[in-house]
Structures are given as structure tokens and as C-alpha cells.
A protein has these predicted regions:
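Helix-loop element at the rim of GNAT/NAT acetyltransferase active sites that forms part
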Residues: 24-40
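Conserved active-site alpha-helix within GNAT-family acetyltransferase domains
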Residues: 123-124, 137, 144-172
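Short hydrophobic/aromatic beta-strand element in the GNAT-like acyltransferase core
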Residues: 57-62, 72, 104, 109, ...
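Conserved GNAT acetyl-CoA-binding A-motif
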Residues: 105, 131-145
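Conserved acetyl-CoA-binding loop-helix of GNAT-fold acetyltransferases
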Residues: 107-114, 118-131, 151-155
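Conserved acyl-donor/pantetheine-binding loop and adjacent beta-alpha core of acyl/acetyltransferases
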Residues: 74-111, 168-170
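Active-site rim helix/loop that mediates acceptor-substrate recognition in acyltransferases
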Residues: 37-60, 64-66, 70, 74-80, ...
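Conserved N-terminal entry element of GNAT/NAT acetyltransferase domains
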Residues: 1-18, 29, 187
């Protein structure tokens, strides 16, 4: 029998809710390891996920090998009253941080199980979650010590605009990255 192939799919918040335990387990597996070392973050993830999946425009991109979850990305559009830009170590101009409907899509998580990395799965999830987005730009945060992720994001067109203090206890500061989305690139 042939080995199962990788499959990718997009889920809305309602469909994603049925995968909450799997997502939480994978989140814990990835973020408890270096360079993140965010032990105990699983409970915080569960609370954040409940909030995120209910946001208008929420989307989850998942990668599976057979039925086995090997990676996912999730995000949602930022609202005008977002706190995304609130904890920057250096303030940015209002023209960067002011949000309006349709301006910014936030990639809240993008992760792949360690044995499945360096196979293009992260890039495929990245491209899937951002494909056909109507927003002008996207943003995400990444820990400076996550050098492989930093290099990947740079090669995918992201640029650092700031650093943010993480409000989660024991979590390191993160770089805030931004990139134009394809519909607006070059306009």
C-alpha cells in the first residue's frame, strides 16, 4: 500500500474547533522546545485559540500526513481596536500602527513538527493561509533566537518593523514582521 501523501486544507473557526486538542498538543510540542522554551503555554494556547477562532475572518491552514497533523498556521484580520501594536519596545508612527477594516491580517501561529521541517511544509502553510487574502498586508511575531524561522520569513518577503514585549510570563520578546499581500504588492 502506498504511503499517505501530505494534504493541506483551510478551515474556518467552527471547523477548527473540532481540532483544538490536536492543535494544542502540537503547539505544546513545538513551543516547549528550544529556542522558545515556553513550558506550560498549552493552557494559555487553549484560551487564545477559543478567542481567535471566533474572530471574523479567522482561518486555519493545516498539513496532514494521512490523518496525522504535522503542521498548521492560523490567523485573523486585525480589528481597529487591536492591541497588536501596544507593547512595542519603541513606538512606531501612527501610519504603521493604525488599523482599519481590511488593512492587516495577523498570522498568530505557524509551526511544523520537528521531523517534518525543511520539507517545504511551513512555506506551503504560509502560502495557503495568505492566499487570496483581501487585506493590504500581513503581520506576525517571531522570537529573535528562532534563526531558522527568521531566515525563512525574510526569504518569503517579510521585514522587521519593531520588537514587542511579550505579556506571557516567561516568554521572550518577539520581532514584529510585516509584508505586503499579493493583491497590493506593487500598487
Amino acid at each position: 500500500m502506498p504511503a499517505p501523501e501530505l494534504t493541506f486544507q483551510l478551515l474556518d473557526g467552527t471547523a477548527a474547533a473540532g481540532h483544538a486538542e490536536e492543535l494544542q498538543a502540537l503547539h505544546a510540542e513545538v513551543y516547549e522546545a528550544p529556542p522558545y522554551r515556553r513550558a506550560g503555554d498549552a493552557a494559555q494556547f487553549a484560551g487564545r485559540f477559543r478567542v481567535h477562532r471566533r474572530q471574523p475572518g479567522f482561518v486555519l491552514a493545516e498539513a496532514r500526513h494521512g490523518g496525522y497533523l504535522v503542521g498548521y498556521a492560523l490567523g485573523m484580520p486585525l480589528r481597529p481596536a487591536t492591541s497588536w501594536w501596544a507593547d512595542l519596545t519603541t513606538p512606531l508612527p501612527d501610519d504603521v500602527t493604525a488599523e482599519r477594516p481590511g488593512r492587516t491580517f495577523a498570522v498568530a501561529d505557524l509551526l511544523v513538527r520537528a521531523p517534518w521541517r525543511r520539507q517545504g511544509i511551513g512555506r506551503a502553510l504560509h502560502d495557503l493561509i495568505l492566499s487570496d487574502r483581501p487585506e493590504e498586508r500581513a503581520t506576525l511575531t517571531v522570537v529573535p533566537a528562532a534563526t531558522a524561522a527568521q531566515a525563512a520569513f525574510r526569504s518569503w518577503g517579510w521585514r522587521k518593523v519593531a520588537r514587542t514585549r511579550n505579556q506571557d510570563p516567561g516568554s521572550p520578546a518577539s520581532d514584529v514582521l510585516v509584508r505586503a499581500l499579493p493583491a497590493t504588492r506593487g500598487s
